């Protein structure tokens, strides 16, 4: 981590996630970042959602979660899927109860692909953010990058400028705006 950009304040390591509490060096904005690797076993979904909800309870501030959740929200996020499953409902409940936003995906419809026999594709990798995280970072986008070796497409989460409020008064700006320069 570049200490010129972020200061690490705290860390929580869970069974399916690792979370870091960060402070922006330039703007003092404190937020949580969580990397997720969801379970492959349907019986462990409750454990994941409880683990992540405990992170949220400990750090009730701006939050960004990124990773392989190993589940989808809607049937259209998996090729050939037509019905909702209990895992989907649990994921949707987690997103709603924590007031998270699933950022739109640019560049592809799916993030995971298997081409052995019948092709299988789904959007199990994603970035979820809290509203105050999204408001702080301008022009947030989530984009699929080129897949090289893995069966997962890498994601690029990009944020533009940081919201800093009103800019400081500068005499030169006033003089220029009045046409003296």
Feature map (PLM): residue ranges:
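A shared catalytic/ligand-binding motif for oxyanion handling
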Residues: 1-181
């Amino acid at each position: 981590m570049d200490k010129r950009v972020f200061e690490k304040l705290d860390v929580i390591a869970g069974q399916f996630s690792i979370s870091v509490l960060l402070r922006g060096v330039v703007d003092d904005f404190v937020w949580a970042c969580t990397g997720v690797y969801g379970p492959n076993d349907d019986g462990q979904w409750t454990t994941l959602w409880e683990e992540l909800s405990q992170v949220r309870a400990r750090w009730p501030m701006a939050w960004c979660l990124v990773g392989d959740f190993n589940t989808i929200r809607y049937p259209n996020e998996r090729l050939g899927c037509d019905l909702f499953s209990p895992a989907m409902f649990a994921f949707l409940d987690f997103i709603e109860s924590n007031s998270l936003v699933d950022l739109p995906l640019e560049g592809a419809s799916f993030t995971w692909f298997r081409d052995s026999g019948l092709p299988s594709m789904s959007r199990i990798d994603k970035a979820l953010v809290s509203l105050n995280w999204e408001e702080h970072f301008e022009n947030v986008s989530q984009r699929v990058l080129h897949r090289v070796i893995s069966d997962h497409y890498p994601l690029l989460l990009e944020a533009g400028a940081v919201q800093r409020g009103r800019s400081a008064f500068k005499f030169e700006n006033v003089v220029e705006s009045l046409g003296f320069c």
